[in-house]
Amino acid sequence: MAEKTEKPTAKKLRDAAKKGQTFKARDIVALIVIATGALAAPALVDLTRIAAEFVRIASTGAQPNPGAYAFAWAKLFLRIAAPFVLLCAAAGALPSLVQSRFTLAVESIRFDLTALDPVKGMKRLFSWRSAKDAVKALLYVGVFALTVRVFADLYHADVFGLFRARPALLGHMWIVLTVRLVLLFLLCALPVLILDAAVEYFLYHRELKMDKHEVKQEYKESEGNHEIKSKRREIHQELLSEEIKANVEQSDFIVANPTHIAIGVYVNPDIVPIPFVSVRETNARALAVIRHAEACGVPVVRNVALARSIYRNSPRRYSFVSHDDIDGVMRVLIWLGEVEAANRGGPPPETRAPTSAEPQARDGVAPPGDACADNAFPDDAPPGAAAPNAGSPDSPAPDGGAPARTGDQNA
């Protein structure tokens, strides 16, 4: 059998609480009840009313009716005792509910024949809890002896003075001395109560300890199999990446920073002439966006200032490019249009070197062909459309066309 070395989990504690196995410091609850009763007794137990009832009965000359006499005493007892009993019951119920975390032990109400098992009874008889209770009983005997000694030293004059007290004050003095004796006993027993609660808490968690196999099995039951959940996460990530890939393929160009930020820009003049952000990724996802764009022939422009500005001014994906960044985006689109016209072999536009705000062509030719058919430009593509591979406007094209390149930052 595996050794139980693991602490009980939250689910284990909840299941045990439903079975009635909760941490119970019964002596602390008893201390609260006794202290509440001792403090409330002088205020709730009205001896004057009891004495007045005796005087009333004695003053009647005729023989009282036994039934009416018993009913009157019952009413008086309820008026005096009912508030006292209810207060003590509430003082005992509230700490018990707090200890059980307001969990109702429904399963403990059922009739369980295993509680009559003599083997389990012998185990309980020679358990650590039984040894703890035996030691606690001996400590309480010592506490009671100490309480009597201290009480005798403090209040012996008041006790012997009862012989000379007036009869009307005897009841009140007895109540006061009794309350003092009870409170003194509780004060002397407080260290034993705290020690008992600590040992009880230790034994409670010791009984509910679990082995590693139980912890793993409970995790599988509550959270699901780890391998299945990992596969689900991978599938979910693949679904998300497919959406991002589609956005990359439909973008006019990707502006990078150069490895930490990737911003996709899409323009559809038929709908609205303002460009908007189609992709907005950082770090590892930004690198993946750049690789996928290069594989699909989507121009990748490396412009640190523009990428950072768009990332800062456009905090959400599918939002329009801010007014401060439109000029830089339009410069890139114009430059890409010039590159596309040169690649198609048409009449080249007025060639010029890109300004500092425009990207420069980086060395290295992108893979030939278009890996994403949806992004291939037809022969009648408008001049403002983005090129599948961006090149430098100064690069001549062999056989009437310019090689496709990706842009790089010059600033």
From Swiss-Prot:
It comes from Burkholderia pseudomallei (strain 1106a). Part of the bsa type III secretion system, is involved in the intracellular replication of invading bacteria inside the host cell. Probably necessary for the lysis of the vacuole membrane and escape into the host cell cytoplasm. Residues 341-411 are annotated as: Disordered. GO terms for cellular component: plasma membrane. Gene3D superfamilies: 6.10.250.2080, secretion proteins EscU. This is Secretion apparatus protein BsaZ. Belongs to the type III secretion exporter family. It is found in: Cell membrane. Residues 370-404 have a biased composition (Low complexity). The chain crosses the membrane at residues 28-48, 80-100, 137-157, 175-195. Keywords: Cell membrane, Membrane, Transmembrane, Transmembrane helix, Virulence. Signal peptide: none annotated. InterPro entries: BsaZ-like (IPR006307), T3SS_substrate_exporter (IPR006135), T3SS_substrate_exporter_C (IPR029025). It comes from the Bacteria. GO terms for biological process: protein secretion. It is a multi-pass membrane protein. Pfam families: Bac_export_2.
